[in-house]
Amino acid sequence: MEFYRQTSQYTGAAAALLMALHAKHPEEWPLDREHEFHIWTHSANLPTRSSSIYALALIARKAGMSTHVVVGEREYDYPDYRFKRYKKIEIDEAKYTSKLYAKRAREEGIPLEEREFTLQEVKQHLENQALILLRVNAGVLRERKATSKYVLVRAYIQGEYIIMDPEQGEMRIPEDEMQEAFETLITKKKRDHRMVILK
């Protein structure tokens, strides 16, 4: 799989999805800033600048991929919004934006499940040739402070997850490190687990 590095601090999820779309439809989804920003501007959970998982799934579906969304909690939440200089009213508006994207995804027939899942389930989907857009504490993978980010998980081989980190590139992550990145998303960042299963 070809790597594409995000060009903005806000386009990590968009860049991760772009790599998946390019892998399936390289002519229609070239790895460039125009397509990265197309995804971002069509998925931004306004007024915040992060992408909505439901909007990302919609974009993938419109591009011809089979999509399935699993979230620990359906409603949008941003516990450390004050550190990003957002106001509570802006987070409430982002919750509404998220609901609109979720409604549109349901109308398009995208399965949306609200439940917990494990890395074992992620592995099973990888064995079935799926790509997984997965939210983790990327700080563990990047050896930095905790940060909630989406990465594209493309394979599990001999005890290692092969991921495309839109900031770092392709990485081989040992199982224990991936488990830490998965678990500390909840314990350190207070964010729910989320994934889009792409085929």
Model-derived segments and spans:
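Intrinsically disordered, low-complexity boundary segments flanking structured domains
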Residues: 54-57, 119-123, 180-186
